Amino acid sequence: HSEKKLLAVIRKELQEIAEEFADERRTTIEKADESPLEVEEEAAAPEEVIVAFTGAGQLKRINPALYKKTPLPTRAEDDKEFADFLFMAKTDETLLIFTDHGNCYPLPVASLNEVKPKERGQLLSGVLAGLEDDEKALWMTCIRMADVGHLPDILFITRQGMVKRTAAADYDVRSKKFAAVNVKDGDRLLTVLPAASRDDLLLFTRSGLCIRFSLDSVPVQGRVAAGVRCMQVEDGDEVIWCGQLQDSDQIVLLTDRGYAKRLLSVDFEKQNRNGKGVKSFYFNKNG
């Protein structure tokens, strides 16, 4: 009998609980969703491509197999289709394009249209936002942005004799266009080049003056600096060429009248930066 009494007590307590907490079910039972789970796709593996910038000012992204069958012509064959810059690149890399207005334009390789070697490429004006009508590319390199800091320092030389040296890491900028160097009014950027393991810089002006000075005398400055003076350029003259030099190098000078001479690098005496330079060529009335 005690068992019956116990069951009666339990039944009574359960009824009291049910009455006290009686309300609608707060959760719903729904049919299982059998649609497949959407899994985020992994990024495609980087693809190897050829990137070329031609004498006609066109960028081309080419399949390496097609390029092997039909390479671009040499400069002697076709200076318009000759590649002024040619890279074996990957689609996860970025072109850093430096212009004579002192700007840098990062351009993802993956954004370029793939074309056949003989097909028309893309003009810079069509792929670089903010490019001025008279703005021209001087130098470019292709690299993963995470690796920019591994590049050597970058040198900027202007027509009025300014030089700036900046660590490549300063150009890891996430923007479609940014200032690479502060070019003063009335001046124009002439050359951009990586600071190779060469000892000196050699500059020539239109009037035949030249100066050779140590690369170590050029301080490393920030990205938007204007640089330091490397040569005192006279009024009416301008720097027309700059390169890096070692004692084992030879230099060939050519004039617009067809005169030429070859010199050893040791013939160019090293001077202090910011000098007036010395005559490398004496012009007579015939050129």
Put a short name on every predicted segment:
Residues H1-G287:
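C-terminal interaction appendages of subunits in large macromolecular complexes
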